[in-house]
């Protein structure tokens, strides 16, 4: 059984969808799960044992043309996507994004069985023939409920090439409490061992302060600071970041994480830290890391302080 899993973007949303992909592979291990995603997000799914193949598609480019009503270009890109997906001969497509653009991806997949969210907007409901009930539950639970529709689809389509897929365990509702519930809901992001080693090397490059106060700390805490966010209303003032670092200067080392935007935006903060000698206990990684490297650095931290942004979910 070939399955196309559709969650195109962005960091937090894709990570929230990983439990649903894992549910599918754990309940239907013989199925091949292909995840279609925006190219810039591919790294989030690398090394994920529950994803057999990552299919990149220029979702952002398509949306840009959509906003400008470039109909010929949109039509061309859709047909190119259709031609790209056709050789896979998908049996099932699973859409946990629920937008018009993902509905068009379902249509391009050619899959006869199309699972999706209930209560969606942008006409997405036109493209799915199995829908989860509308819900206000946590998004991870809602995504898993879409995946669980596969049980119903398999029982109704005997032509699907699935052996012993549906059992009593499969058709139980998703668990929502206790240790099993935590396992069900945990998000997947896999950091390879070579990047774990790389992260350790970054910490070793910090020049330790040899002051009396500092020397009393046997092993400073490793604190990750994710400085930026996409929304100005969610920003923490730069002077607050400075105060946090200053207050912990004798107890911690820091790594600053963010993209190229943050490298420019937070230059005043970096300059202030340098002027006060605090750069000696700081790794400035703004605009210097891939998503996998961000994951490795976050994994190596004791504490992470972050704005409401993608790396929060990592």
Describe the residue ranges of each PLM region.
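Catalytic machinery of carbohydrate-active enzymes
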Residues: 1-314
């Amino acid at each position: 059984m070939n399955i196309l899993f559709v969650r195109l973007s962005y960091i937090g949303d894709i990570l929230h969808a990983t439990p649903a992909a894992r549910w599918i592979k754990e309940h239907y291990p013989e199925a091949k799960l292909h995840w279609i995603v925006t190219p810039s997000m591919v790294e989030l799914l690398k090394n994920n044992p529950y994803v057999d193949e990552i299919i990149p598609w220029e979702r952002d480019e398509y949306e840009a043309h959509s906003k400008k009503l470039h109909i010929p270009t949109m039509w061309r890109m859709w047909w190119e996507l259709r031609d790209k997906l056709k050789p896979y001969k998908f049996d099932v497509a699973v859409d946990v994004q629920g937008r018009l653009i993902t509905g068009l991806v379902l249509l391009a997949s050619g899959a006869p069985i199309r699972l999706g969210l209930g209560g969606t907007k942008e006409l997405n409901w036109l493209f799915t023939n199995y829908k989860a009930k509308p819900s206000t539950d946590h998004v991870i639970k809602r995504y898993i409920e879409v995946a669980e529709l596969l049980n119903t689809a398999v029982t109704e389509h005997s032509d699907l090439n699935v052996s012993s897929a549906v059992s009593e365990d499969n058709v139980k509702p998703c668990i929502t409490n206790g240790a099993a519930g935590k396992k069900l809901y945990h998000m997947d992001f896999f950091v390879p061992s070579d990047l774990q080693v790389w992260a350790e090397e970054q910490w070793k490059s910090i020049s330790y302060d040899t002051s009396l106060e500092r020397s009393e700390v046997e092993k400073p805490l490793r604190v990750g600071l994710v400085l930026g966010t996409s929304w100005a209303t969610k920003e923490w003032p730069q002077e607050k970041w400075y105060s946090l670092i200053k207050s912990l200067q004798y107890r911690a080392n820091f790594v600053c994480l963010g993209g190229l935007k943050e490298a420019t935006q937070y230059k005043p903060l970096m300059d202030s830290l340098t002027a006060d000698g605090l750069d000696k206990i700081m790794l400035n990684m703004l605009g210097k890391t891939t998503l996998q490297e961000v994951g490795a650095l976050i994994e190596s931290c004791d504490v992470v302080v972050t704005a409401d942004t993608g790396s929060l979910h990592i």
